[in-house]
Curated annotation (Swiss-Prot):
GO MF entries: DNA-binding transcription factor activity; sequence-specific DNA binding
Keyword DNA-binding recorded: yes
Residues the record marks as site: Interaction with sigma-70: 241, 250
Keyword list, A-Z: Activator, Cytoplasm, DNA-binding, Repeat, Rhamnose metabolism, Transcription, Transcription regulation
Protein name in the entry: HTH-type transcriptional activator RhaS
Principal location: cytoplasm
HAMAP family linked: HTH_type_RhaS
Organism annotation: Salmonella paratyphi A (strain AKU_12601)
Length: 278
C-alpha cells in the first residue's frame, strides 16, 4: 500500500497545515499517510473507499481522514477536491482541544463523512484561499494567524454539518443523501422521501441532479451497485443474495445494471478479474 509522507507535502518541517488542491482528482489507489487530512469535495462525483467501506461523494462532501486511516478514489467523474492537510493535534503552537470540533469514533463507528451546503462551501473556499496566501513566516503573529484560519475552518465545518440541523433546501438534500446511504436496500418511494425531508418532488429531482449529475433513481441504483460490489469483494454471499441485500428484486436485472455501470459482471468481480487494472 502506498504511504504518503508529510515531508513531501508540507512547506517546512514546522508548518502544521498545508493545502493540496486536486483539480481534478483522478482515480487513486489505496493509500494512507503520516498526517491528517480534511477532504473537501468542490464538485463532481466519485466513490471514496474509506477503511474498506465505499461512500458516494459529490460537491459538499467533507471527509476527515486520520493518520491511521486508509482510503482510495475510484469511478471519478470530474471530481475536484481541496485537501487541507494537518500534521497532528500537538503540532500547533496556539491551538488546543481540536478534538472537540472533529468527528469522534464511538463504539467502533467513526462518522468520517459530513456534508455542507453550497453557501458554506463558498465560505470554505474563501477561508482556504486565505490559508493559501497567509505566507510561511515563522514569527509568532504569522504562525498564530495561520492557526486561527485553520480553527475558523473547523468551526465553520462543525457548525454547518448535518448534526447542526440546518433547514434550507441544500441542508435537507444533504440529510436525504445521508439517509440513502443507510437505507439504500429498502424500497424507496420518492414522493414519500421528498415529504419526509420537507422537499417538493420537483426540488428533490432538480437539486440531486445538480449535486450528482444523476436522477434520483439513477443515483440510488449506483449507490446500491457500489454497495453490492463491496460485498462481492469482501463477503461469501452468493450473487443472488447480494442482489437482494442491496435492494434489487431480480438478480438478472442486477447483473445487467452492474455490467453497464462497471464494465464487469458480478462474477468477474467475485473472481477478482478487475484487480488487474486496479
Amino acid at each position: 500500500m502506498t504511504v504518503l509522507h508529510s515531508v513531501d507535502f508540507f512547506p517546512s518541517g514546522k508548518a502544521p497545515v498545508a493545502i493540496e488542491p486536486r483539480l481534478p482528482q483522478a482515480a487513486f489507489p489505496e493509500h494512507h499517510h503520516d498526517f491528517h487530512e480534511i477532504v473537501i469535495v468542490e464538485h463532481g462525483t466519485g466513490i471514496h473507499v474509506f477503511n474498506g467501506q465505499p461512500y458516494t461523494i459529490s460537491g459538499g462532501t467533507v471527509c476527515f481522514v486520520r493518520d491511521h486511516d486508509r482510503h482510495l478514489y475510484e469511478h471519478t467523474d470530474n471530481l475536484c477536491l481541496t485537501n487541507v492537510l494537518w500534521r497532528s493535534p500537538d503540532a500547533f503552537q496556539f491551538l488546543a482541544g481540536l478534538d472537540q470540533l472533529l468527528p469522534q469514533e464511538q463504539d467502533g463507528y467513526y462518522p468520517s463523512h459530513w456534508r455542507v451546503n453550497q453557501s458554506v462551501l463558498q465560505q470554505v473556499r474563501q477561508l482556504v484561499g486565505l490559508m493559501e496566501h497567509a505566507g510561511d513566516g515563522m514569527d509568532a503573529p504569522a504562525v498564530a494567524n495561520r492557526e486561527i484560519l485553520f480553527m475558523q475552518l473547523l468551526v465553520l465545518l462543525r457548525r454547518s454539518s448535518l448534526m447542526e440541523g440546518a433547514t434550507n433546501n441544500d441542508a435537507k438534500l444533504n440529510q436525504l443523501m445521508a439517509w440513502l446511504e443507510d437505507h439504500f436496500a429498502e424500497e424507496v418511494c420518492w414522493e414519500a422521501v421528498a415529504e419526509q425531508f420537507s422537499l417538493s418532488l420537483r426540488t428533490l429531482h432538480r437539486q440531486l441532479k445538480q449535486h450528482t449529475g444523476l436522477t434520483p433513481q439513477r443515483y440510488l441504483n449506483r449507490l446500491r451497485l457500489i454497495k453490492a460490489r463491496h460485498l462481492l469483494r469482501h463477503s461469501d454471499h452468493s450473487v443472488t443474495e447480494i442482489a437482494y441485500r442491496c435492494g434489487f428484486g431480480d438478480s438478472n436485472h442486477f447483473s445487467t445494471l452492474f455490467r453497464r455501470e462497471f464494465n464487469w459482471s458480478p462474477r468477474d468481480i467475485r473472481q477478482g478479474r478487475d484487480a488487474i487494472i486496479q
